[in-house]
Amino acid sequence: MTTPSRIVTPERRVDDVGDTALRPQLLSEFVGQQQARANLQIFIDAARKRGEALDHVLFVGPPGLGKTTLAQIVARELGVGFRATSGPVIAKAGDLAALLTNLEERDVLFIDEIHRLSPAVEEVLYPAMEDFQLDLIIGEGPAARSVKIELSKFTLVGATTRAGLLTNPLRDRFGIPVRLNFYTIAELESIVTRGARVLSIGITPDGANEIARRARGTPRIAGRLLRRVRDFASAADKSAIDRGIADHALSALEVDAAGLDAMDRRYLSTIAMNYGGGPVGVETMAAALSEPRDAIEDIIEPFLIQCGYLQRTPRGRLLTSHAFKHLGLAEPARDAAQFGLFGQGGEEG
């Protein structure tokens, strides 16, 4: 199984084009992230009243929490144009210059995965963000000359899942940093209920709760699960999704009551059965699962760590008692030293 195909991956999938209709259009419709939403509303209202461009905004958080949706909402609330791109797409300074020179006054430019901008592109972006100017070098060698281009005052909205990879000069140019957190089950229930209404299918409170509990704190996953559960309900001639049909559908999709899928359980079972619960190195796990190390560290492990099933220790990955209980296995006797200093572990290389 390749990780992008997992129904519970927080990364965007090809079939997620169907979630566009489920996205809120205004801040008042956006569920969750209460403090971030309240602050954004104040900053937007203030910029609109002054007739100025909003300060540059940086959204930081795991994938699937609504960074792109919030960027679109910011532009809509400001009543300005919206242009979207991503860090890997902007290959050279000229690509960025083309985007910036086509922006109107106060427009929003959204750059997803902004941590993946090349250093050469970043250098061009600094004066654009700070002084609304482009400093470009035209030509090569002795004939090269510097050209300064004035830009319309715009708002750059950046999004990143890995804030630690941002350079300090780039991070410091964002006046409004916003960190997004995982959603509560109650918030996801509201999102699922609204989504069912948009999809024109009924849903009971316990049906919404069943989907929300397995959505791993992530609206994108909740929307994806809702669409698949709706298919099961339609096939069974059900006019509404209740707990029974939700449980049946999600079990058929191999998403268990804790939100773990077959890959998660395979990961935990491999450590439990083959390595006595650990510690085991990440390279060993990558080979055992036939998955790249990056996929292990960035896609599989974060949710398992968040739920308390896994520890990263200096000696390797280690299952917790919670993991053995979830797998229905007896926990082997282990030396306390395996857990690292005071039971906490640093990153194992």
From Swiss-Prot:
Family listed: Belongs to the RuvB family.
Job description of the protein: The RuvA-RuvB-RuvC complex processes Holliday junction (HJ) DNA during genetic recombination and DNA repair, while the RuvA-RuvB complex plays an important role in the rescue of blocked DNA replication forks via replication fork reversal (RFR). RuvA specifically binds to HJ cruciform DNA, conferring on it an open structure. The RuvB hexamer acts as an ATP-dependent pump, pulling dsDNA into and through the RuvAB complex. RuvB forms 2 homohexamers on either side of HJ DNA bound by 1 or 2 RuvA tetramers; 4 subunits per hexamer contact DNA at a time.
Keyword entries, A-Z: ATP-binding, Cytoplasm, DNA damage, DNA recombination, DNA repair, DNA-binding, Hydrolase, Nucleotide-binding
Residues binding Mg(2+), per UniProt: T68
Enzymatic class: hydrolase
Protein location: Cytoplasm
Protein name: Holliday junction branch migration complex subunit RuvB
UniProt: DNA binding residues: R293, R312, R317
Region entry Large ATPase domain (RuvB-L), spans: 1-183
Self-association and partners: Homohexamer. Forms an RuvA(8)-RuvB(12)-Holliday junction (HJ) complex. HJ DNA is sandwiched between 2 RuvA tetramers; dsDNA enters through RuvA and exits via RuvB. An RuvB hexamer assembles on each DNA strand where it exits the tetramer. Each RuvB hexamer is contacted by two RuvA subunits (via domain III) on 2 adjacent RuvB subunits; this complex drives branch migration. In the full resolvosome a probable DNA-RuvA(4)-RuvB(12)-RuvC(2) complex forms which resolves the HJ.
SMART domains the UniProt entry points to: AAA
Binding site residues for ATP: L22, R23, G64, K67, T68, T69, E130, D131, F132, R173, Y183, R220
Phylogenetic placement of the source organism: Bacteria, Pseudomonadati, Pseudomonadota, Alphaproteobacteria, Hyphomicrobiales
Reaction catalysed by this enzyme: ATP + H2O = ADP + phosphate + H(+)
Organism: Rhodopseudomonas palustris (strain BisB18)
GO molecular function: ATP binding; ATP hydrolysis activity; four-way junction DNA binding; four-way junction helicase activity
Top-rank taxon: Bacteria
